[in-house]
Each structure stands twice: as structure tokens, then as C-alpha cells.
């Protein structure tokens, strides 16, 4: 039986994807039946991190090794990820939510609609305040854009008001939020977004 929602989490290396998946699992594990699929190029490091963090039982976490091109495994040939999701859905038929974390990639990465229903795209302030205006599918078309590590703005000379202006211009009415996942700032907005997609749970 398919889960009620398959939610992709994508973004560049180091933007905070795994931190977001960890935080969502901690916040939602009491309310929802959850499972996670992570993607890494040559290891299962993110899956191992989540297992060590104890956010879900290990059998609810699957690590996929994508090889050299992480975006291919979530878009052009997502069969390895579809198989991992399918295994979880077969093992846990009551799943409400499967989180699929992509390997770190560039601003052009996007998920196949065959793999996920919706996508959260994570960028971070440390990459500079110009990132939102550079565009790309993650910036302009993701279902939720998360701009993480706002605490680093003064250290890297990033202007959050510039990021806000450019994000609103690039996304129109699509939702987005600032976060500092290290200390939970803005996480409630992401949790609320996820729960809105599951109104009958």
C-alpha cells in the first residue's frame, strides 16, 4: 500500500537537508507513521547519521548509493529510489509520510513526479545572498523553499532582506521560510507545511 505522502528534500551539499529530515522526524514521529530514504554518492552516511541520532527505528531508514550523478537517481532514472520507497511501503503498510532526501546537488536538481508528490528545497545563507535570484527549479518551483542557517548571515556578509526580496520575486505566491535548524528557528513553519499536506491524519 502506498504511503499517503512522499516528500522529497533536495538542495546543495551542506545546506541542511539531513538536519531538516532529522528535525521533521523528531517533530512528527509521535503524530505520523514515518520512513526515510537517503541518497549519497558513494556511502550511506546520511542514513547512518539518522540511525545514530535515533530519530526513527533503523528498519524505517534506507540508504541509497547513487554513484557519480545524484540528480539522475531522483529524476531521470529514479528506479533505485522507487524500489527503496516501495520496500518501506510494503514493510510498513500504514505509512503516512516517506521523506526522500536527495544527494547534495546543484540548483537545477529536481525530483521525478514518479518518485515524490511534493518537494522541499533547502539552500543556506552561507552560499551568499545572491542564491535566490540565480533561480533554478529548486528555487522557483519547489513546493516549499527553506533558506537555512540564517544565523550565519552576519559572518558571511549576507543580507537577509535582499534574500527575502529576491525570493518573493522568484517564487511569487509559493511558500518559503527562513530557518536556523541548528536551534529550531523556523522549523514550525516547515512542520505546519507538511501537516497541511496530510489533512486527514
From Swiss-Prot:
The lineage of its organism: Bacteria, Bacillati, Cyanobacteriota, Cyanophyceae, Synechococcales. Belongs to the SIMIBI class G3E GTPase family. UreG subfamily. Signal peptide: none annotated. One of its GO terms (molecular function) is GTP binding. Homodimer. UreD, UreF and UreG form a complex that acts as a GTP-hydrolysis-dependent molecular chaperone, activating the urease apoprotein by helping to assemble the nickel containing metallocenter of UreC. The UreE protein probably delivers the nickel. Coiled coil: none annotated. One of its GO terms (cellular component) is cytoplasm. Facilitates the functional incorporation of the urease nickel metallocenter. This process requires GTP hydrolysis, probably effectuated by UreG. InterPro entries: CobW/HypB/UreG_nucleotide-bd (IPR003495), P-loop_NTPase (IPR027417), UreG (IPR004400). It is found in: Cytoplasm. GTP binds at residues 11-18. Keywords: Chaperone, Cytoplasm, GTP-binding, Nickel insertion, Nucleotide-binding. GO terms for biological process: urea catabolic process. This is Urease accessory protein UreG. It comes from the Bacteria.
Amino acid at each position: 500500500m502506498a504511503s499517503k505522502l512522499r516528500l522529497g528534500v533536495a538542495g546543495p551539499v551542506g545546506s541542511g537537508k539531513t538536519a531538516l529530515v532529522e528535525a521533521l522526524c523528531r517533530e512528527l514521529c509521535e503524530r505520523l507513521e514515518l520512513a526515510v530514504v537517503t541518497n549519497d554518492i558513494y556511502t550511506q552516511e546520511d542514513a547512518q547519521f539518522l540511525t545514530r541520532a535515533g530519530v526513527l527505528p533503523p528498519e524505517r531508514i534506507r540508504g541509497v548509493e547513487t554513484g557519480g550523478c545524484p540528480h539522475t537517481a531522483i529524476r531521470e532514472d529514479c528506479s533505485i529510489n522507487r524500489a527503496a520507497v516501495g520496500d518501506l511501503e510494503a514493510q510498513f503498510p500504514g505509512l503516512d509520510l516517506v521523506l526522500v532526501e536527495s544527494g547534495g546537488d546543484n540548483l537545477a536538481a529536481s525530483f521525478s513526479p514518479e518518485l515524490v508528490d511534493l518537494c522541499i528545497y533547502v539552500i543556506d545563507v552561507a552560499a551568499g545572498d545572491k542564491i535566490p535570484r540565480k533561480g533554478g527549479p529548486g528555487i522557483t518551483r519547489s513546493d516549499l523553499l527553506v533558506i537555512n542557517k540564517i544565523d550565519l548571515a552576519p559572518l558571511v556578509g549576507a543580507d537577509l532582506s535582499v534574500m527575502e526580496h529576491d525570493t518573493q520575486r522568484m517564487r511569487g505566491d509559493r511558500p518559503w521560510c527562513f530557518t536556523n535548524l541548528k536551534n529550531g528557528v523556523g522549523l514550525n513553519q516547515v512542520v505546519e507545511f507538511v501537516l497541511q499536506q496530510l489533512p486527514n491524519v
